[in-house]
Amino acid sequence: LPDGSFDYDGIRAGICEKTKLVTIQRSKGYCPRPTISVDAIGEAIAFCKKLRPDVVIMVDNCYGEFVETLEPTDVGADMIVGSLIKNPGGGLAPIGGYIVGKKDCVENAAFRLTSPGLGREVGASLQVLPSFYQGLFLAPTVTAGALKGAIFAANLYEKLGFKVVPSGDAPRYDIIQAIEFGTPEGLISFCEGIQYAAPVDSFVTPEPWDMPGYDSQVIMAAGAFVSGASIELSADGPIKPPYAVYFQGGLTWQHAKFGILKSLQVLVQKGLVTEEQIRKACRTTLKNTNPVEKAQNKIY
């Protein structure tokens, strides 16, 4: 539902004797709803299992790994899936995804990927396994930096008068920070600032384009070492009301902060935000909220 809760009446009506799999998407995607907490996912799983004990519950865990103490498999999910070029790859994994869960679920997925009987025992490793393991080792620290950046962005833009989801002091269940600008110019300018702060292709200016699968143009900013890695500093959003940007990532807290400040610089240069607004917001944010300490306390 729009408020991030589950439509239990709809779930009850939807699960029938033919239902084999129920999927839950943890993160918000391009929806304005809040991200779903692991506790809320656990309650939904218990509800589904009460209706059909044999139904398989699969959770799309993208952007949520290492944000909370528990993962969906700790609260009853049969399997979780995600991307290695997001949180769990630590910015080092160049490709790949993961499937974690009960043995039979993982085996069935592997058989579907390759062939029955062979499963995950075959396939090229592409000589990237060391990057997978090293990225996984660094992933909690990298995710912590991304969380700090999201909290900083939320507090700063909230003080500037923009609607942010989640708010600066709200609990965090993934690394994504949404900021609603109300105009396409604000959304585009923010993405330009993020791109200009990138370690790769910082000379490029992102522009909206007709991306397949979307009902509006989409703009994306990501000067990343790994193509498509949204655990690196990145931002994107559809060019339609409320003109919200979805900001995430930053391999270090310092780079995330730099990208956010760069986005403000572009907004000032285009006259969308005044320098006095920013000075006032910075003073208020630094006085009332220390996003670094808050994020550290949440994680550690």
Q: What is each of the regions a protein language model found here?
A:
Residues L1-A144, K148, A154-Y157, G161-V165, ...:
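Conserved PLP-enzyme active-site core in the AAT-like
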Residues E158-P291:
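Conserved C-terminal alpha-helix-loop-beta "cap" of PLP-dependent enzymes
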